[in-house]
């Protein structure tokens, strides 16, 4: 039995999809425990590139059952559009299963998300506008719509009417928008009932019974540690807990059953949207990382902000997630750049901080303190073992390992599934 949690260690887009794709072929279940269609990832299989948004990367594995856990918020229109796209390409997306307790994104959530961001102007968070935040807000306010609700029309209608009593007041009186007709929302959800019905299960029961039977489970977290609503750069965060603890909550698997916590981390750092980013680059090197690394958001098409590796963030992520291992991605992007700066600490108003500053204000004012290491010029995209890497690349990896306080067990040297060096297999932990 193995229960492995995959967590982004930075601000997202670290390559979690690749890690899931590699490990997904060795497990029985791949679970997405949080998020929605607001965080895309790219997976390359057999030379084919797949851009996934709501579905877990495990849907591309022939052996694993992909599951959307209770912590996910689901846009049904986006879900079936993504599934149909995969089916058209020969993927058996019909194996997907969905927790009956997952919450649903309604069209009014998306409307509210967009008008609220527009209203905030320069103070906007930089959301994707897909209704994720408002859906989670309804969840914690106990007025959300769950998957199970669509199978009882009277409950569905009651919940929608109750929710719109408040939301229409907000839309009409505050944002000068038209009121939403409750019956239209009811019919919207009822239109998906028959296709949805065979996919819905008691996910926590299925997963725990699987673990009892010795099966392997992989939990594929969305977003990343620094976007966690509790542990991230609040308020520039997502609305869920994309950390190891959140994976337990969003799947129904208890923390004592977790065998490995695998952090996915780039050899440099990126971020999409607003918020503090101490190592962000505004010079030719930022442009180099963006261009060479292909740093464009899968969901939004926005260019990602780029910066050097931040070991303060890495140590923080290792601590709050209890990482047992790290998966270092995109090492090949740094080939041939001469010198590689590594942020080892911050300067905040003349005071050195080796760990994450306590306050939001201090983090906003943090200036990176760098050390540099020599880069390598050799092509590493064909390296199969750690010893195949040039000495300078090995030294860089070992230094990141030392600074992060966690062993690096996987190293990505290219986008392909086979372009991964395995130093330690977490399936054998």
Swiss-Prot record:
UniProt catalytic activity: IMP + L-aspartate + GTP = N(6)-(1,2-dicarboxyethyl)-AMP + GDP + phosphate + 2 H(+)
Enzyme class: ligase
Entry cofactors: Mg(2+)
Binding site for substrate: 298-304
Active site: 13, 41
A GO term, aspect molecular function: magnesium ion binding
Keyword vocabulary terms for this entry: Cytoplasm, GTP-binding, Ligase, Magnesium, Metal-binding, Nucleotide-binding, Purine biosynthesis
Family: Belongs to the adenylosuccinate synthetase family.
Protein name: Adenylosuccinate synthetase
Species lineage: Bacteria, Bacillati, Actinomycetota, Actinomycetes, Mycobacteriales
């Amino acid at each position: 039995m193995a229960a492995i949690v995959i967590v982004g260690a930075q601000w997202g887009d670290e390559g979690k999809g690749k890690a899931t794709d590699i490990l997904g072929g060795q497990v029985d279940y791949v679970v997405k425990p949080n998020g929605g269609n607001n965080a895309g990832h790219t997976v390359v299989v057999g030379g084919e590139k797949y851009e996934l948004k709501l579905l877990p990367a495990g849907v591309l594995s022939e052996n694993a059952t992909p599951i959307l856990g209770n912590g996910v918020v689901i846009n049904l229109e986006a879900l079936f559009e993504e599934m149909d796209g995969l089916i058209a390409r020969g993927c058996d997306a019909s194996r997907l299963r969905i927790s009956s307790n997952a919450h649903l994104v309604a069209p009014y959530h998306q409307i509210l998300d967009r008008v609220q961001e527009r209203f905030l102007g320069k103070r906007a968070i930089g959301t994707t506008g897909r209704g994720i935040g408002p859906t989670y807000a309804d969840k914690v306010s106990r007025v959300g719509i769950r998957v199970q609700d669509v199978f009882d029309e009277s409950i569905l209608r009651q919940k929608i009417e109750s929710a719109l009593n408040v939301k229409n007041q907000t839309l009409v009186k505050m944002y000068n928008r038209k009121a939403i007709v409750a019956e239209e929302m009811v019919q919207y959800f009822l239109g998906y009932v028959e296709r949805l019905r065979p996919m819905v299960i008691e996910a926590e029961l299925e997963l725990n019974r699987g673990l009892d039977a010795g099966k392997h489970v992989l939990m594929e977290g969305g977003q990343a540690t620094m976007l966690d609503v509790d542990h991230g750069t609040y308020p520039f965060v997502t609305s869920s807990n994309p950390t190891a603890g959140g994976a337990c909550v969003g799947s129904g698997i208890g923390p004592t059953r977790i065998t490995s916590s695998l952090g996915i981390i780039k050899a440099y750092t990126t971020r999409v949207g607003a918020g503090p980013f101490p190592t962000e680059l505004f010079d030719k090197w930022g442009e180099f990382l963006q261009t060479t690394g292909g740093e464009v958001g899968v969901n939004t098409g926005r260019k990602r902000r780029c910066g050097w590796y931040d070991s303060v963030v890495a140590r923080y992520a290792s601590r709050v997630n209890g990482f047992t291992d790290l998966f270092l991605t995109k090492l090949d992007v740094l080939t041939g750049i001469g010198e590689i700066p590594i942020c080892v600490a911050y300067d905040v108003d003349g005071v050195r901080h080796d760990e994450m500053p306590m306050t939001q204000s201090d983090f906003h004012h943090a200036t990176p303190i760098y050390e540099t290491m020599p880069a390598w010029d050799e092509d590493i995209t064909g390296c199969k073992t750690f010893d195949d890497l040039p000495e300078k690349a090995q030294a860089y990896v070992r230094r990141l390992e030392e600074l992060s306080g966690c062993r690096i067990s996987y190293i990505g040297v290219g986008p392909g599934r086979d372009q991964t060096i395995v130093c330690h297999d977490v399936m054998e932990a």
